[in-house]
Structure formats: C-alpha cells, structure tokens
C-alpha cells in the first residue's frame, strides 16, 4: 500500500486570521468571526458555517485556541499564546538542527573532496615516479642489443678456427 501524506489546505486558515485581525481583548465571538470571513474572503457562509464551527471546536481541543466564554462553537475565542510560543520554539529548534546537519554535510563533502585531491596527487606522483623507471628499462634493452652483435662475431670466429685446423 502506498502511504499518502495529507496535503495542506490551498486556502488560508480563515479562523485564525480572523481572530488575529479582530484583536479583541476578551476573544472574538462566532458572529464576529463569520462577518470577518464573509467580508475578507470569497466564501459562501451558508456552506462554510459548519466547517467554521468544526474548526473552532477542533482548535480548542488541540490547544491552538482558548474559549473565553460559552461552550462548544458558541462563545468567544482567543489564540492560545502559550501554545504559539511553544510551537515557535520547536520550529526554531528544528531549524537549528537542520542548519547543523547541513553544516556537517558540507564539511563531509569538503573532506571527501580533499581526500580525492590527495589521492589524485598521490597517483600522479606515483605515475611520475613510474615513468622514470621505464626510461632506464629502455636503455637496458638497447644495451642488450649491442651485446648481441659482438656475440655473433665471436661465434663466427669460433667456427672459422675449426675449419682451418682440419
């Protein structure tokens, strides 16, 4: 089975933006939130009212919102400042960890590149050392050829001497 991840909503979070923009000290009421969403977003309130109520209830359950008055979806709502600060702190920690990981990866890449360069230099040095060794070997081959020619002459002289004796 394929694991599917939930896509984030394409629209902005209407309820939280409404509560933050209304800036009421004792919290924003459901009616005030509805009016703000109707005026600022292109939304039909008849269809979206149920979703807004559900968003308010789930926000209170999750701790993102605090209900200052009333019960359920009716009453007044404020953003939970403590939860927002905690989330901001968690995000900051995650960003720091990501930055550390990226720094470690970059260091590892730099070390790997340095090792490759050292290896390339070492192999180039070995090749340079190996090349002079080959040159003397060629000279030795030439010397061997020179030695062969006198041997032929001595062999010819040996053959010539027995002929004269008999």
Curated annotation (Swiss-Prot):
Residues 152-166 have a biased composition (Low complexity). Its main location: nucleus. Residues 124-138 have a biased composition (Basic residues). InterPro entries: H1/H5, Histone_H1/H5_H15, WH-like_DNA-bd_sf, WH_DNA-bd_sf. It is found in: Nucleus; Chromosome. Residues 90-166 are annotated as: Disordered. Residues 6-81 form the H15 domain. GO terms for cellular component: nucleosome; nucleus. Signal peptide: none annotated. GO terms for biological process: chromosome condensation; negative regulation of DNA recombination; nucleosome assembly. Residues 90-120 have a biased composition (Basic and acidic residues). GO terms for molecular function: double-stranded DNA binding; nucleosomal DNA binding; structural constituent of chromatin. The keyword Nucleus applies. Keywords: Chromosome, DNA-binding, Nucleus. Histones H1 are necessary for the condensation of nucleosome chains into higher-order structures. Belongs to the histone H1/H5 family. PANTHER family: HISTONE H1, HISTONE H1, EARLY EMBRYONIC. This is Histone H1.1, embryonic. It comes from Parechinus angulosus.
């Amino acid at each position: 089975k394929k694991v599917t991840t939930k896509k984030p909503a394409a629209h902005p979070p209407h309820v939280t933006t409404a509560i933050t923009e209304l800036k009421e000290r004792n919290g924003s009421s459901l009616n005030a939130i509805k009016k703000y969403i109707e005026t600022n977003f292109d939304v039909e309130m008849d269809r979206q009212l149920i979703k807004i109520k559900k968003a308010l209830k789930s926000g209170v359950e999750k701790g993102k919102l605090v209900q200052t008055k009333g019960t359920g979806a009716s009453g007044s709502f404020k953003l939970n400042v403590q939860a927002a600060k905690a989330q901001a702190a968690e995000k900051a920690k995650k960003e720091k960890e990501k930055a550390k990981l990226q720094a470690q990866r970059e260091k590892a890449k730099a070390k790997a590149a340095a090792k490759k360069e050292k290896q390339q230099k070492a192999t180039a040095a070995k090749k340079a050392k190996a090349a002079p060794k080959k040159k003397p070997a060629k000279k030795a081959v030439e010397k061997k050829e020179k030695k062969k020619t006198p041997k032929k002459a001595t062999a010819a002289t040996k053959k010539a001497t027995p002929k004269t004796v008999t």
